[in-house]
Structure formats: C-alpha cells, structure tokens
C-alpha cells in the first residue's frame, strides 16, 4: 500500500491538549473489506479541506506491529464501557485509569493493574451482559471516543499499522474485524500528523487460527514487521508458527511466564529453530549487566575475574526468569559449564547451581526468591547480587543492589562490607513493557548475546531432566 497524504478538514480545539487525534473511530467490517476500508479512510480525507490552513496527515512508513493478546482485560473493559481507547493489547495510561475506575466502583484496591479480583468482576459483568443481550455492544460504541490514546511510548515510534489479535472465550462465531486510524500529536511537529492504521481481529483461538493465512497479506511489504506475542510462545501453535515465520522480530516478555523454567526452554527451542527472538525481560537486566562489567574495568580487577567462584542473586519471589537470565549471561561470558541444579521451596525459593570453569575450578551460585510486600508491575525484578571468591586474596568482590533497600540480606551475610566494590542500580521507569517495546522496535534481527545467555540457562534446566 502506498504512502497517502491528506488534509485534516476539521481539527478540533481539543487537539491542542489531546495526545491522540481520532482520524477514524473503530468500524466493524468484514474480513475481505479491510484493505478497501482503510483505503477509503485516506481517500475520503484526501478530497476534503484543501485550504491548506490546517495540519496535513500522513500515514507512517515505519513498521508493522502484530500484537497477540490472550489476556482479555482490555477487551472486557471496552465491552463494559470502561475503556475507550484502541484495542491494541498495549497497557497504557488509559487502561490503568479504566482499571482503577472498575476497582473503585467495586470497592477493590485501586492498583490500576489487572488483579485476579478485578478480572473476576469483569468476567462476571460481561457474562451478565451477554445473558441480557447487551454484552459486547460497548466493544464498539465504547471505542468511539473523540480522543482515544494509543499507549504513549508506542505512539511516539509512529507505527504504520498495528494488527491486534484477540482470542476470546465462548462460542465460535467466526472472526470480527474492526479498522480505525489514529494520529499521535507530536509537540515538535504541529504541521503534520503522522497516523497509524489499526486492524483488530477477535474470535476464538480456533477461529483466529483458521484465518491465519489471511494475516500475512495485511502486513505492509517493504517495512519491518514485529510480532509481540503476549502469551507463552508455543512452537506447536499454528498461528504462532505462521506469524513468526514472516516477522523480522518475535517479542516476548518472560516476566509474565507462568512456568518460567519450562517456558524459557521453549524460547531456546525457538532460537535453535532460527526464530529471531527478543525478550523484554532481558532488556530489564541492562543496568545490572553494565554495572557488573564496569566493576571489572581496571586491569587488576579484570585479572581477578577468574577467581570468582561464589555468586549470590536475590530477586523478588514469584518469577526467577530475570535471575536465571542474568546468571546465564555471567556464565556465558566467563565460560562456565553447569554441572548440577537443585531447588528448595519455602519462605525463600532457593536454587543452587554448580558450574565448572575453563580451568576446572568449582563455582557455586545461589538464587534466592525473596518475599516482598510490594512486587510492583514486574514480577521477579532483581534485588541484589554478590560476586566473590573463596580466595581471600582475590580482588574480585562486588555487590550491586537496587535502590529499594536491596542490600539488606547481603549485609546480614556480611557481603556488602566485605565486597571490594559496592554499587547501586537506580530504579528505572522505562522497565515497563510498553517502554521496552518502544526501544525494541528500533532494532530487529537476532541478538547473539541474548541467545548465548539463554543457551546456558537452558543447559541448566536440562540438568534436572
């Protein structure tokens, strides 16, 4: 499809304060009308408002993003009239506000996140509406807002087209399609609106798989294509295989994995099969990796790296994926081979892993899932890590902690005082999936460092089998 340029006939005054201008509100169409309807949007605007006094609107020519959103929160919020933004599977400020509204109405803790209690309420309300013949009517009407919001960070990257796939429960009634168009308001560019086309496809998982052959035709040729698979990737899932084969990058977030160890093994299988994979949770480790590397910048410290034979990593109990990926990265850089793997569950989730170094030294690593009162948005964030040696003369000790009091347990064990180097990781707001995705779509292809680290992590799990 070629780039189109249009004049905006009636730009509302509200545009000056809104972050998104709705060029075309979501409209129900049949599957074979998608391209024709999108073309019609541009043609209808192209013959209006030719006075040249208003900002023009141009369809972005950047990338296509396919979002597979198995978690039904956004769809339910829209169907019940709480949410009036695009159904894109991306958690943005408007989603959080809608969740808080539901929670306030039903006297639940106002977290702005999809807690289990909130989901239960949404499902019950949706079921009541279906029985009364009104369920889902807001799924369209509730989206007809004058100023809907694409998740801010994604909008700033000006995607050309977002295709959102929403598997839903219930009877198989085929696939429903909607198209719409939105233009993020860029403060630095008031003369032109860069617009994004939205295609939303919803139906049962079986129905979506049936029409999977049509989806590649909806991707815009000549532009990078990203698949954000917000479920556990299944190498045997037909729809996943079809989409992964045609996208430049397949993006997952292991912080949401229900069974992190077996799910990370699945990721390794995909890498071995040649899938260009990216894990947003891996990107959350960047500051920890950078500080660890900086700790051994000096020649003396670098020479002592081989003396490291004790590793302790504390993480927020609930998901060990970050801790395991960090350990996989460290082991891959220092060429350690895993030889044993043990787990203990209790107040703390303890994992003990033994490695053999290149010079046949024994290396012991302990991962501890620490219970915390407020987990926050990301389950399993790193809290602290300690690298040390059984050789008291070795200058290789390092302790790195998060700024949220992460060193308390390390200090109890004498680690922070005895370490040769102590550093803190500043808590970063961009650790949420929305912002990390915004960074990820600026690059594509295979990530060798991630793949090597994942390979070592997978070898650890295989010791348990």
Curated annotation (Swiss-Prot):
SUPFAM superfamilies named in the record:
PGBD-like (SSF47090)
Q: One Pfam family, short name please? A: PG_binding_1
Q: Which PANTHER family match?
A: OXPP CYCLE PROTEIN OPCA-RELATED (PTHR38658:SF1)
Q: What task does this protein carry out?
A: May be involved in the functional assembly of glucose 6-phosphate dehydrogenase.
Return the protein name: Putative OxPP cycle protein OpcA
Q: Which species?
A: Nostoc punctiforme (strain ATCC 29133 / PCC 73102)
Its ancestry begins with: Bacteria, Bacillati, Cyanobacteriota, Cyanophyceae, Nostocales
């Amino acid at each position: 499809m070629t780039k189109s340029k249009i004049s905006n006939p009636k730009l509302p005054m509200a545009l000056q304060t809104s972050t998104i201008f709705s060029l075309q509100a979501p409209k129900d169409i049949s599957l074979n009308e998608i391209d024709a309807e999108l073309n019609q949007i541009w043609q209808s605007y192209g013959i209006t408002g030719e006075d040249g006094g208003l900002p023009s609107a141009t369809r972005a020519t950047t990338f296509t993003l396919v979002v597979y959103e198995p978690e039904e929160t956004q769809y339910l919020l829209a169907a019940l009239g709480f949410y009036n933004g695009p159904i894109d599977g991306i958690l943005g400020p408007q989603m959080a506000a809608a969740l808080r509204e539901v929670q306030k109405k039903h006297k639940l803790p106002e977290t702005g996140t999809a807690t289990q209690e909130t989901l239960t309420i949404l499902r019950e309300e949706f079921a009541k509406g279906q029985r009364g013949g009104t369920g889902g009517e807001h799924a369209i009407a509730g989206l007809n807002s004058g100023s809907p919001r694409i998740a801010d960070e994604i909008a700033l990257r000006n995607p050309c087209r977002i295709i959102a796939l929403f598997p839903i429960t219930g009877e198989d009634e085929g696939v429903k399609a909607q198209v719409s168009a939105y233009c993020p308001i860029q403060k630095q560019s008031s003369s032109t609106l860069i617009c994004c086309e939205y295609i939303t496809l919803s139906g049962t998982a079986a129905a979506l798989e049936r029409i999977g052959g049509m989806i590649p035709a909806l991707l815009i040729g000549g532009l990078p294509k990203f698949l954000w698979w917000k479920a556990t990737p299944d190498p045997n899932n037909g729809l996943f295989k079809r989409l992964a084969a045609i996208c430049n990058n397949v993006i997952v977030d292991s912080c949401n994995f229900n069974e992190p160890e077996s799910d990370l093994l699945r990721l390794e299988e995909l890498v071995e099969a040649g899938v260009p994979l990216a894990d947003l949770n891996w990107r959350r480790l960047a500051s920890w990796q950078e500080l660890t590397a900086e700790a051994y910048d000096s020649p003396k410290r670098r020479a002592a790296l081989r003396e490291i034979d004790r590793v302790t990593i504390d993480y927020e109990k609930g998901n060990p994926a970050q801790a395991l990926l960090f350990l996989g990265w460290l082991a891959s850089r220092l060429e350690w081979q895993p030889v044993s793997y043990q787990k203990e569950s209790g107040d703390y989730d303890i994992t003990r892993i033994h490695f053999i170094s290149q010079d046949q030294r024994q290396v012991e690593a302990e991962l501890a899932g620490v219970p915390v009162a407020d987990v926050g948005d990301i389950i399993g964030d790193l809290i602290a890590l300690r690298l040390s040696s059984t050789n008291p003369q070795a200058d290789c000790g390092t302790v790195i902690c998060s700024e949220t009091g992460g060193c308390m347990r390390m200090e109890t064990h004498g680690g922070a005082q005895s370490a040769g180097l102590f550093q803190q990781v500043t808590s970063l707001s961009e650790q949420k999936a929305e912002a990390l995705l915004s960074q990820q779509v600026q690059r594509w292809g295979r990530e060798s460092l991630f793949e090597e680290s994942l390979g070592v992590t997978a070898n650890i799990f295989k010791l348990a089998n």
